[in-house]
Amino acid sequence: MFASPIGPLRLVASESGVTRVCFEGEQLPIDEPSASPLVTQELTEYFAGTRREFTVPLDLTGVTEFRAAVLRELAKVPYGETTTYAQLARAVGNPKAVRAVGSACATNPLPLFIPCHRVLRSDGQLGGYRGGVEAKHFLLRMEGIDV
């Protein structure tokens, strides 16, 4: 478990990289391996405000092609900036797939590393977040985004 300001996080990895970040209350099989100390170091630095980009390898094995495309595009959104579900849909070449993009964000296995907290609704409202709206608000404020 990683103690973060938004609650305890369980970090799961494969030989290829981090596979999942789980918020408190989410269940995982017991035999899933924990992530390396480098992963926790980078998260510690992120929450301390000294890291703006993650360098640890990520493993999206098992994610559908469309969702992986959305997540790869989302990973490009820089620290301190936001995008919208509609902008992401356009960026992956499917401007009518706004709801599918929302679903991809909601099921993002790697929140924080792939920053779904930086996605807002088109009206500027926060929208949902798997870790809770309060956590999303905290992360955005921490990154200097006034929402």
What residue ranges belong to the model's regions?
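…primarily DNA-binding HTH/wHTH and HhH modules…
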Residues: 122-147
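Short Lys/Arg-enriched helix C-cap and helix-to-coil transition segments
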Residues: 112-119
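LysM (lysin motif) carbohydrate-binding repeats in extracellular/periplasmic proteins that recognize
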Residues: 95-98, 139
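Basic nucleic-acid-binding alpha-helical/helix-turn surface characteristic of O6-alkylguanine DNA
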Residues: 1-96, 144-147
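Short clusters of hydrophobic/aromatic residues that line enzyme substrate/ligand-binding pockets
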Residues: 56-60, 101, 126-129
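Regulatory, non-catalytic segments
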Residues: 98-108
